[in-house]
């Protein structure tokens, strides 16, 4: 699996420590999410999420992808926490997916998820959670 193929519409890359301010900015704009799913985001919570894995996957950090989806202007439009081969070998888990507030409601998130599903189906994945 190659995560750069997760989207045909956006550039996908792994997010790293230096991206935390960018991720934090995107997340902080989505206050309604954190009203329903506290606590509110912090740089430390993002840092923790970037490496968090379910207990069964602790020995397989290579299956963890904390991804950014960028438009042609290199603006971050979405963040995704993706775990490969979980909970089964032919499935994957999206632990977190958040869109830039200013582009919500235009079908971009649906397009990203649809493109991801098409790609994973082409690889034989049976289930996406």
Give names to the regions the model predicted.
Residues 17-18, 72-75, 87-89:
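Short strand-connecting beta-turns/loops that link adjacent beta-strands
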Residues 68, 75-84, 93, 98:
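Conserved beta-strand in the GNAT
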Residues 56-62:
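Short loop/turn motifs at secondary-structure junctions and domain boundaries
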Residues 31-54, 65:
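Conserved GNAT-fold acetyl-CoA-binding loop/helix
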Residues 120-129:
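Conserved GNAT acetyl-CoA-binding A-motif
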Residues 23-24:
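Hydrophobic pocket/interface hotspot
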Residues 1-18, 35:
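Conserved N-terminal entry element of GNAT/NAT acetyltransferase domains
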Residues 103, 107-115:
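Conserved acetyl-CoA pyrophosphate-binding loop and the N-cap/start of the following alpha-helix
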């Amino acid at each position: 699996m190659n995560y750069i193929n997760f989207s045909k519409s956006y550039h996908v890359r792994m997010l790293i420590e230096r991206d935390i301010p960018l991720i934090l900015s995107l997340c902080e704009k989505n206050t309604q999410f954190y009203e329903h799913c506290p606590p509110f985001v912090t740089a430390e919570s993002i840092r923790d999420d970037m490496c968090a894995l379910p207990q069964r996957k602790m020995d397989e950090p290579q299956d963890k992808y904390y991804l950014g989806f960028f438009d042609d202007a290199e603006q971050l439009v979405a963040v995704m926490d993706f775990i490969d081969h979980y909970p089964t070998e032919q499935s994957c888990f999206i632990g977190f997916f958040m869109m830039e507030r200013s582009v919500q409601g235009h079908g971009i998130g649906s397009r990203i998820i649809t493109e991801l599903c098409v790609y994973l189906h082409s690889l034989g994945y049976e289930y996406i959670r």
